Amino acid sequence: MRIMFIGDIVGKIGRDAIETYIPQLKQKYKPTVTIVNAENAAHGKGLTEKIYKQLLRNGVDFMTMGNHTYGQREIYDFIDDAKRLVRPANFPDEAPGIGMRFIQINDIKLAVINLQGRAFMPDIDDPFKKADQLVREAQEQTPFIFVDFHAETTSEKYAMGWHLDGRASAVVGTHTHIQTADERILPKGTGYITDVGMTGFYDGILGINKTEVIERFITSLPQRHVVPNEGRSVLSGVVIDLDKEGKTKHIERILINDDHPFSTF
């Protein structure tokens, strides 16, 4: 089984990059399933139903979220019925949506779990205990278990990777929007990367205009974050190959921008 996961889609530039590159990436890598993190897809914050459907039309099979899950109020109207979407499972039980879903691809069932960290993030339920619970539940149905851990710090993400080594097929980090070069296979067979990176505006800061961010650092005054609709793009992702027992046998980063052009080789 081959999983292709694309990191945080930020705004229109990120969505356009998905539309442009997903067909080419599918032709090159031939993934069994394509998953994206969509928590910033609607102008940098949240997800609308229109964009959810657009991403599915553009070749995305499944979506994960993060701390901006409820950034667009309309998500309350469709998240419970969005069968190709998960939000962080360690949100309180009262939160709309669900944190683990299964996707069937031919004769393979894949569990997709979304978790959110707590270090320098909102104080929510324990992601480690929730991971234990959901992985146990998933293992009753499938050995193929994919985890998107949406978290701020390298240490918390690495801790989750080690915590789930041998139990989850892969643990990938999202949220910081900067791709890390530490992809590896942990000793018991779990594929891991601290952060997959983002898909969005290449010439800004974490997908937003740089001018306002720089001004805030200089003046310490609040600034409005502006997500541009035009500009050069970056696409960040990872391809993970799993064996028949659900263990990672290969993990490879994807990075496409003007400094790292797409190659069919």
Residue ranges and their predicted role:
Residues 1-265:
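Acidic, metal/ion-coordinating pockets
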